[in-house]
């Protein structure tokens, strides 16, 4: 099969011993196979062999490496904060881990490294970053996951413009390593302009149906 990476290899068999039998795969290991998501997840080890999935893993690895390099070049220090910490309720519920040594007491998985990175700032680490695992015990939605990875960053003794400038340049360098050129500076929009124009503080500015204030048009009417 010349479509496979090893398709041109031929083997001349003189003896075969069957050590075990295998079931027919649940789906073909190809990108364009129409397979239900629950089947793909049940046979994840097969799904990861598909070229697209393997490429996604490689892309994530390469981009994470590029981010780390970009932060390192700007004298940021990567610090792994603990995954077992005290419960510090934020916007969601904590995942609790019972303590074997202290019955009835619990650790909590961090919703974010917020308190821990603040300790680093007090301790003299003025530029910190981490590719951090976060855990939030909340209902599953498109933009809500119980476990996710975020790039966590903190800087001391800086202004708002310092933070935005450093992150812009870091992202531009990382994307540049991936062959994507970013035009700097990135577009900036004031909070109230975003709310007045789009009705949300994180708008997709490609959306053409902007909010229009028609108060003057209907002033004095019963509408």
Residue ranges and their predicted role:
Residues 1-223:
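Class II aminoacyl-tRNA synthetase catalytic cores and aaRS-like
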